[in-house]
Amino acid sequence: MNHNEIITHALNQLMKSVLKLEKTTNIPQELDAVEGRRFLLRMLSASVDSFVEYIDADRPQFRHSEGPHRKMFGDCPDADYLQATIDLRNGRSYRVRGTIPQGTNYVGVMLYGRGGRIGVCITDEQLEIGNDGLFEILISANPEDNPTLLGNGDEHMVMVRQYFTDRNKQPPMELEVEFLGDVPEPKPLNSAWLAKRIELSRRMLESIFMRTLDAYRRISNFPKNTFVDVPVDLLFPTPDNTYKICWYELETHQMIIVSGILPKA
């Protein structure tokens, strides 16, 4: 295949996956079916972002992975999810610097490995934070570097979570990430590279849907109107949280009242 045909083939395979996955959203309830298709479009966008756009591990930048217009899995509307691409192979290392405002509820920094594997994590309670809120984290897979977060070598992403109770009063943290090494010149775009990244986007899209459908099947078997604990390995969570889910059905003119007791800090 020539350079145009390589890209066309990759795009065709991606579109075939989209059409195949679209059939899984053929749900009897109209609203659920519409939401399923919107979720498909959002995950397509997220997959392309992850493997075509925001992929420079030599010049990483933090970006919001979720927001008002892209909901993924069980993300919390009262949290910011900031992610940056990294590559810990061949002794590479990174420095994360930031400022945590006073009164911040929670900050967690986590590495993710191949296939979404949950890596090491550190929270604001474990960080060395200055009086001005400044902190610094060293990320490496080399124990001799004495890193703050020691990876296995397959990590491709660092994610920072910040939780809020009142966004109007609690400012977002300042954050930056830097590759600690000689930054090479950017490589020119070529068809083989782009075709490979499109294929990786396709695989991510299918993986997201398979994991989401698996989670749906598991959760839908839970007893109705009863909160149950969800395994922390389900849908890229943080191990610092406990996740409880209640499966419910509402008839016309019904409502749900959720009550509980908050634990003392």
Describe each PLM feature range.
Residues 1-265:
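A compositional/structural signature for long, glycine/proline-rich flexible linkers
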